[in-house]
């Protein structure tokens, strides 16, 4: 038996997808799972669905978060300023977008949030630090107590 799901989130109830659309999406996703087959191991270009990309991005965020860094529990420790992706990848944080779910003028410590690059041209530009982690690492807070705010991945002309 195959199964899948779909959902909608928004700041305002009127912006939510209607129930018929949600049901149709869930049904279509479930049907696409039928007759799946295994492929032999090979190197191929991959396109991730948005839901999968969010999960992968979550792993990156955890690896560059202050807690993992000051505990020496990150594979990206001491990688600031170094390439971690191909040069066409940019990941930036935009905390002040109107109506966006992650928008916030301040982090959970009251520090002002600001737009900035996390990765630019494949190079790690910024860690994700609250005040405590920043002090432990001898750096400045990035206004990310409580997490990140509206991360965007841009791969230039590869989009």
List each language-model region with its residue ranges.
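Surface-exposed beta-loop-beta
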Residues: 67-78
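Internal alpha/beta scaffold segment
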Residues: 1-64, 68
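Generic signal for short, ordered secondary-structure residues
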Residues: 5, 9, 70, 88, ...
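Dual-mode signal for accessory low-complexity, basic/Gly-rich regions
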Residues: 63, 77-159
């Amino acid at each position: 038996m195959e199964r899948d799901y779909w959902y909608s989130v928004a700041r305002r109830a009127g912006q939510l997808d209607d129930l018929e659309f949600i049901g149709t999406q869930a049904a279509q996703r479930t049907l696409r799972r039928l007759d799946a087959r295994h492929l032999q191991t090979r190197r191929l270009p991959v396109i991730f669905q948005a839901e999968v990309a969010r999960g992968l991005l979550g792993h990156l965020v955890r690896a560059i978060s202050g807690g993992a860094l000051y505990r020496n529990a990150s594979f990206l420790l001491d990688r600031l300023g170094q390439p971690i992706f191909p040069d066409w990848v940019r990941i930036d944080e935009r905390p002040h977008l109107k109506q966006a779910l992650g928008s916030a003028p301040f982090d959970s410590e009251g520090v002002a949030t600001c737009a900035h690059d996390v990765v630019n041209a494949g190079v790690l530009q910024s860690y994700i630090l609250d005040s405590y982690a920043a002090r432990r690492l001898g750096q400045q807070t990035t206004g990310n107590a409580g997490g990140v705010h509206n991360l965007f991945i841009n791969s230039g002309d590869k989009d």
